[in-house]
UniProtKB/Swiss-Prot annotation:
Enzyme superclass (EC): transferase
Keyword Repeat part of the UniProt annotation: yes
Known EC number: 2.1.1.-
CDD domains xref list: AdoMet_MTases
UniProt-recorded Gene Ontology molecular function terms: histone methyltransferase activity; protein-arginine omega-N symmetric methyltransferase activity
Stated name of the protein: Protein arginine N-methyltransferase 7
Domain of life according to the entry: Eukaryota
Limits of the SAM-dependent MTase PRMT-type domain: 14-357, 366-697
Amino acid sequence: MASFSQVINPMTGQNTWQERGDDYDYHQEVANAGFGDMLHDWERNQKYYAALRKTIAAMRKAGKEVHALDIGTGTGILAMMALRAGADTVTACEAFMPMANCAARILAANDAAQVRLIRKRSTDIQMGIDMPHRANLLVAELLDTELIGEGAISIYNHAHQELLTDDALCIPARATCYAQVAQSPLATQWNSLKVLPSLDGDILLRPPAQLMECSGEAALHDVQLSQLPPNSFHTLTEPAQIFQFDFQRKQPREQQREHVLRLQLSKPGSVELVFYWWQIELDDAGEQLLSCAPYWAHPELQQLQKSFKDADRPLPNIVPWRDHWMQAIYYIPKPLQLHQAGEQFWLRCYHDEYSLWFDAHKEQPEQPARRHSCSCDLHLTYTRNRIGQLNQGTRNKRYLAYLEQAVQQAKPAHVLVIGDGCLLGLASSALGACSVRCLEPHRFSRRLLESVAKHNKLKNVRFLESLQQLEPEELNTLTHIFAEPYFLNAILPWDNFYFGTLLLQLQQQQKLSESVEISPCAARIYALPVQFLDLHKIRTPIISCEGFDLTLFDEMVQRSAKQALSQVEAQPLWEYPCRALAEPQLLLSVNFANFGVEQHNQGCLELTAKGNCNGVALWVDWQLAANNSSKSIVSTGPLEPIVPGQFVKWDMFVRQGVHFPSQTDDQTHLKWSTTLRPLLGELTFNFSLQASHEETK
């Protein structure tokens, strides 16, 4: 039986009803559960297995029976490892019911049906009912990028109190958290608003005081640190141990701690950021180490370099790849300017039950500090990517070049700015526009831009909650409609075609003069077949892991993905290196002066570079003016011309679209089609890889 769900269509801005099966939420949860790339993590799998074999062998040698408990078993992989390694009994628990049911089938298929599977959270297990006795070996994977964000502290505390013997061993046994202080003009663009200069270097907009004084959000910014361009940051200290977690300790792990470290600068600079990662010791002796460090700090980098066979793989990608455990950036609330190498400062590190945060001081702090939070609306309203966009110099220059020319030629210029948080449109007032109307329906975004306008004494700006607030005489005098475009509801780049929908609404209110200049005037969607080094693993079937058959898991995920995942998903591709396998292909062109026209296009693209096409990257180029100059193009895709066979350098402040083909071997052509129904807010893509003999069919 089907049901209807209300969803927002980002291209139309309307709430629409979509017919969905009763099990849609189930399929969506399965498809997005994220087990896949974890099971492709060969280092994790091998070291967990090695730690289990070693620990169980030592326990049996000591004359102990081994009763293992696997908390959050997922596919059952760790439970099966424990059983095969010689545990006398194995109990596994899994609260996510679709996964638990799948695990039961996987256990049976791998002759491991003797594993006791409990379909509960570990904290709901009742001794004597669900488990006959306590376990003396706990194996679990309860960690995330922050280490403790999935509730590891309380889960381990409960397990030791209720489910484990006093002498129980744990895999992993311990974890150590690391921090490295850094300076990065690039990374700080994701956190604070800079001044907006004109093309001549004069300041057009200054951030108001509340933005300059705001401490920002304490929350982590999780990224693949190894992919930061080496010239974009400087590490100012060596990595320092900040917290240790003993998972084997019977005594409860503290839910809140503060650690103050005295650190020394290796070079002068601004203490702006903390790079964070962790390392686990899987066995009691600490011989099986697994580090999430970026490549430059990875303890096994030299070993990995010697053993790695792919000479074409860049150094940052030699360390084991994983997307479920990344690194994180934390932003210092008030950066410290330190001018001499060897100068010392104090780094304050905090954690609560689920998260961490940091601060820095020139003098040793005496009073405890509260977790900082945003007080300026910027960090509450916009994503890290959006904040970075607002500061992106090259991008801003292209918009400002258009605006300067447009405002100077119009005289007087009356500008309607459409989009959320469009500081560039606001800057048209500072460039000399006679009047500026800014459509800002989001309350926090509008409040932020009002404060910027007030601080910069812009007198001719009016903010609108809706287009209906425009008076007929204002529409009659309009000379320009400008957008980046950017909207808060947008996920994929073409979701910002909502700009076209708003233009149609304006035309319905009152027919606009043909002399009104619209920017961007057009948009183009491009596709590029690529070979990812690693990103494809999030959607690639597992088949087998450490000798265990996981095809039942693959089938479950693939069934759910077909029903719940779109053909294209959003990813920040700068974090996931890929090689181009052809020149970019234009899929669709949109003219915003005539946005309501439906389109259907199709074609076939030859893969001209060697490689396995495991992904198709998509992006939008916005054309600001009708002059066809390359300087009028703002791209959300590659930053440099594409060279087939070479790595692609992607825009770091926007997410691109990605399609993952299901069949990737021995294919030479990419067949594609796309359909745009703008009035319905529908944009669909279809891709299929084909061998050369199929291409003409």
